[in-house]
A protein has these predicted regions:
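NTP/phosphate- and nucleic-acid-binding module
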Residues: 2-4, 18, 29, 37, ...
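Long, mixed-charge low-complexity alpha-helical/coiled-coil segments
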Residues: 9-10, 453
């Protein structure tokens, strides 16, 4: 029996993937391969042939460094094993402590040598993670029960930092672009994700340990093995180049090709050394049963976008039927990752901030493009990647006019994404936009650029900006029978052929009873093309399926054909989607702002911009004497009235240690109430800036508003130092 799907008014060519000008020529050259390209980037048949230039110099360097570090690593491991054995044997605590001291000494020796051998931009992730954990920016979920890989809890500082990032995101995008907003359900019925393609295509390849059942994502397993393999000095350069080529082709490989690699290299479980099962496909969505009967299958949403798409008609109506418009949503999404790793970068539950910009497929210009036209960006095009070239810096206008970026709307959002990331503190030298190759493209995208941040884990995708064409709305039109279209007046009326189903309402009523109305509405909504196809199917097969209901010829005995004049055309809009991974941006921001004081390597801090810093200012009385209390209270109350989160630190520690504590958690400004504040009639205080540690002296009544302006970005610290005298020392000390 043929299944009949509702299909109407799909824009022709809407699913063709965009090709920049540099890929429209017939041939592309790489170091060892001259290949033909077809317009369809998503073709696995052709994509698997591509070769990329691979620079292995960093691999050679790492291998040489590791050779020098190997004896030190062995010494540390030897000491650690000895301590574990001593504890197992119940050795005296004092003896164990002595061994621990020796272990610390060896670890310090290894750490110093590592810093010496690696380039000067070496990042001390261990120190940053120590600060994150001590100050509870975030930690493993359910840690007291051993924790769960791929799940994290945000602490007070982490929550505030994320909230501030999202607040700026709302200002930067939702308010400035006058976007609509929705908040949709996390529990998603299966038909929705079946229509979107997630049920069939949202999967990774997985293998298991044959004895323990431990699961591994196959491409990650192969990559880890290969990277370790080519780090071996005994491996010839020719073999290293061949392995590097295979690493770059992993994303193109089929499940069978990956299975062949496992067998050829006799890969084992990295945890136990046991054999591995054959690969299987694993859908990354969390399945659920909705309701007590368990009959309604569903999933936890893998993205927030689908909630916006299924509400398109209501949003269009709210926007008075006009295009273009954009809708935003912030919320959690869920992906059942096979082997979560790299901290917050690959997790099973994460916050997304997504925008769906709906526009006409034949007009993707943007009215505000001129406002970002001169924005310079580092763009790593698909062409450059395939030719082994470096990313290029250019304006977004050059990229759009040169055909590198598909259209103005896509380019506009890319520029706005960069502005937002730089505003919250992402290092511009560690930010680039990389264009997806065809094999990387999501099943719904026709062009996509990722904003990537360089971290100690490498280049990490933090924001995706995709032209999803008309895919989603077309799919939901088929799946639901509801026309996800917009009407656009024609310049001139035109005559079209019309085909309308004429159902037998009595027969349908007897068969479907309470669902009869739903069936009749579905038949009434058929496009002429869909109705024609249905008539043909009923003639050939005798039955068809509409929206899950099986219909026979007796239920739809006839179809009416006529010509009619139309004054509007129905168009399924295209969608441009910026999608922000908040957790990844959060982690990249912490790495990019992590600092170690030059004069004291033990003093670490986060140089977070004031606009996103969890706490904006600290109030530090130099003494606990009662005469200080009114000034501290005055400052705290005024700062609170100005919506400035603050921390009062009146502990007995030295002022230097208190500065260090507030620096650690990223507080950008500190107000010190000293003896001059109390004793002088002017009642001045000092204001300290975290990064430079510079201090100025100013009247106590003026400092709260100055901090408000500093936090809002309306005032820069340089302007403050130019207006107020630099603080050197107190005039009074008691």
């Amino acid at each position: 029996m043929k299944t009949f799907q509702l299909l109407s008014f799909v824009t022709k060519g809407a699913q063709l993937r965009y090709l920049p000008n540099c890929l429209r020529s017939a041939e592309i050259f790489t170091s060892s391969l001259r290949e033909k390209l077809v317009p369809e980037w998503g073709s696995k048949k052709h994509a698997s042939k591509r070769k990329l230039l691979v620079n292995t110099n960093h691999l050679k360097m790492d291998a040489e460094i590791e050779k020098q570090l190997a004896p030190l690593r062995a010494r540390v491991k030897e000491q650690g094993d000895l301590i574990r054995q001593m504890k197992t044997d119940g050795a005296p605590e004092m003896d164990v402590k002595k061994l621990v001291q020796e272990l610390k000494s060896r670890k310090k020796e290894l750490e110093d040598m590592t810093l010496k051998l690696y380039p000067q931009d070496f990042f001390d992730r261990a120190k940053m993670n120590d600060l994150i954990k001590r100050r509870f920016f975030y930690d493993n979920s359910f840690a007291i029960y051993g924790g769960i890989t791929g799940q994290y809890d945000y602490g007070p500082l982490g929550c505030d930092l994320v909230d501030n990032m999202l607040t700026e995101w709302q200002k930067h995008f939702v308010i400035q672009e006058r976007m609509l907003k929705v908040n949709c359900s996390i529990l998603t019925p299966e038909p929705v994700l079946k229509a979107s393609g997630h049920v069939d295509k949202f999967a990774d390849y997985m293998v298991k340990d044959v004895k323990t059942g431990e699961c591994f994502r196959l491409d990650h397993l192969i990559k880890q093995y290969f990277e370790k393999y080519i780090a071996d000095k005994k491996v010839s350069q020719e073999e290293k180049d061949e392995i590097s080529r295979k690493i770059n082709l992993l994303d193109d490989m089929t499940m069978k090709e990956m299975d062949d690699i496992v067998k050829a290299y006799d890969l084992k479980s990295p945890s136990t050394g046991n054999n591995l099962t054959d690969a299987v496909e694993f859908n990354l969505m969390f399945p659920i049963s909705i309701g007590p009967s368990g009959n309604m299958a569903g999933f936890l949403r893998p993205e927030t976008a689908q909630g916006i798409f299924v509400n398109f008609k209501r949003l269009l109506e709210y926007n008075q039927g006009k295009l273009p418009f954009a809708c935003a949503q912030v919320g959690n999404a869920y992906r059942n990752e096979i082997s979560p790793r790299s901290g917050l970068l690959r997790v099973r539950e994460f916050t997304m901030a997504e925008i769906e910009h709906f526009c006409y497929p034949d007009n993707k210009s943007h009215t505000k493009f001129n406002q970002v036209a001169d924005t310079e960006m580092v763009l790593y095009s698909a062409c450059a990647q395939m030719d082994g070239e470096s990313p290029k810096r250019m304006t977004i206008t050059e990229a759009v006019r040169g055909g590198l970026v598909a259209n103005e709307t896509l380019g506009y959002y890319m520029a706005r994404i960069q502005q937002y990331l730089l505003k919250i503190g992402i290092n511009p030298k560690k930010l680039r936009f990389r264009q997806h190759l065809g094999n990387e493209m999501a099943h719904y995208a026709c062009d996509c650029w990722d904003a990537e941040c360089l971290t100690s884990y490498g280049w990490i995708e933090c924001v995706g900006c995709a032209d999803r064409s008309a895919y989603d709305l077309s799919q939901h039109t088929k799946g639901s029978g509801v026309r996800m279209s917009v009407e656009r007046p024609l310049k001139e009326p035109k005559i079209v052929d019309s085909v309308v189903a004429l159902p037998d309402k009595v027969a349908i009523g007897k068969t479907f009873k309470k669902d009869a109305k739903v069936v009749q509405e579905a038949l009434a909504s058929l496009s002429s093309e869909a109705a024609e196809d249905m008539d043909k199917t009923l003639n050939e097969v005798g039955e068809c399926v509409v929206n899950g209901f099986k219909l026979t010829r007796s239920m739809v005995p006839a179809f009416k054909r006529e010509q009619k004049k139309i004054h509007v055309e129905e168009i399924i809009p295209s969608v441009i989607e910026p999608s922000f991974g908040i957790g990844r941006i959060f982690y990249s921001l912490l790495e990019h702002t992590f600092r170690i004081r030059e004069d004291d390597e033990k003093r670490t801090y986060f140089a977070l911009p004031a606009v996103v810093a969890p706490i904006k200012v600290s109030v530090l009385p130099l003494s606990n004497k009662t005469e200080f209390i009114p000034f501290v209270t005055q400052l705290a109350d005024t700062l609170t009235d100005l919506n400035l989160p603050l921390r009062v630190d009146d502990s007995t520690g030295s002022i230097g240690r208190r500065y260090a504590r507030t620096d650690e958690i990223g507080i950008p400004f500190g107000i010190t109430v000293d003896f001059d504040t109390v004793n002088n009639l002017a009642h001045t205080v000092t204001l300290r800036e975290r990064n430079s540690t510079e201090q100025v002296r100013m009247p106590i009544d003026e400092v709260p508003l100055i901090i408000r302006h500093l936090a809002d970005g309306k005032l820069q610290w340089k302007e403050v130092t130019e207006k107020w005298p630099k603080f050197v020392a107190q005039e009074t000390t008691k």
